[in-house]
């Protein structure tokens, strides 16, 4: 997810200390959990930290609290966002509509963003290639904003260290803007439609693209897109409906 990351302090505080072991440790933990859940093969091997990326052990002790806090803010933001989506689901259930509602939850539009570079109190510093060290930013943070409690608040546009982005891309290499690696381009999709999709707890391995969403919705609604609109010939839709995989986890992929 790109920045800036803003969240109420109490949400970030829920993750106090959770990331003090650094981004390599988080990437490894995520990788092992993905194995346990069946998302990746049991014999998969974790890639090492990408060349040129700063190792957690090389982050000065005086800066590690700052770097950890940026990830706590991000985690709090994610949980808060999920909670709001949950309210929509709860309302659908309360109205008796959830059973026959198709929900498509796409996690993001790309891989995790490394645009925060070395961790920043202002994402624009990194985006505009304005030279500044973490030490300089911490000095400004203390002098002008009152210290760490300002992180995640409305006066700053914080963005976490690229190491956290790399950890979030597990099990793949790369991050947002790196089109050559799956870590920059792949993102999970969760589907829910209780009336039509039998829950089997199995991950769907078929490869699909965001341009498959519209054909899926048309398919579900039994709609054939018009070939002509006001005398203008329409370009055929790219994409393939996902419905073939709804109740057959091992179905042959409809696209290659």
Region annotations inferred by a language model:
Residues 1-25, 29, 47-73, 107-126, ...:
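Active-site His/acidic residue clusters
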Residues 4-9, 93-193:
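Histidine-centered active-site microenvironments of extracellular/periplasmic hydrolases
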Residues 18, 32-41, 91-95, 216-224, ...:
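Structured segments of extracytoplasmic/periplasmic soluble domains
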Residues 18-25, 58-61, 65, 72-76, ...:
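Alpha-helix capping and helix-loop boundary segments enriched in small/acidic/polar residues
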Residues 38-46, 180-181:
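Proline-centered turn/helix-capping motifs that create local helix->coil transitions or kinks
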Residues 44-49, 255-256:
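Short coil/turn segments at secondary-structure boundaries
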Residues 73-88:
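Outer-membrane beta-barrel transmembrane strands
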Residues 154-182, 196-206, 210-256:
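C-terminal cap/loop subdomain of S1 sulfatases and analogous C-terminal strand-loop tails that border
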């Amino acid at each position: 997810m790109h920045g800036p990351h803003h969240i109420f302090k109490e949400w970030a505080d829920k993750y106090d200390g959770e990331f003090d072991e650094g981004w390599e440790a988080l990437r490894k933990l995520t990788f092992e959990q993905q194995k346990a859940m069946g998302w990746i093969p049991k014999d998969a091997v974790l890639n090492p930290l990408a060349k040129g990326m700063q190792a957690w052990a090389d982050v000065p002790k005086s800066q590690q609290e700052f770097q950890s806090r940026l990830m706590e803010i991000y985690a709090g933001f994610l949980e808060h966002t999920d909670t709001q989506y949950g309210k929509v689901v709860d309302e659908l259930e309360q109205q008796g509509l959830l059973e026959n509602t198709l929900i498509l939850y796409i996690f993001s539009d790309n891989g995790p963003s490394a645009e925060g570079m070395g961790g920043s109190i202002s994402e624009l510093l990194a985006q505009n290639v304005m030279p500044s060290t973490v030490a300089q930013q911490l000095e400004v943070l203390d002098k002008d904003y009152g210290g760490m409690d300002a992180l995640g608040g409305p006066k700053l546009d914080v963005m976490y260290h690229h190491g956290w982005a790399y950890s979030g891309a597990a099990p793949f290499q790369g991050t947002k803007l790196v089109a050559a690696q799956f870590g920059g381009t792949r993102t999970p999709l969760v589907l829910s439609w209780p009336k039509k999709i039998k829950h089997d707890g199995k991950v769907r391995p078929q490869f699909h693209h965001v341009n498959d969403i519209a054909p899926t919705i048309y398919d579900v609604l039994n709609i054939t897109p018009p070939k002509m609109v006001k005398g203008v010939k329409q370009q055929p839709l790219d994409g393939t409906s996902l419905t073939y995989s709804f109740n057959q986890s091992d179905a042959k992929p409809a696209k290659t």
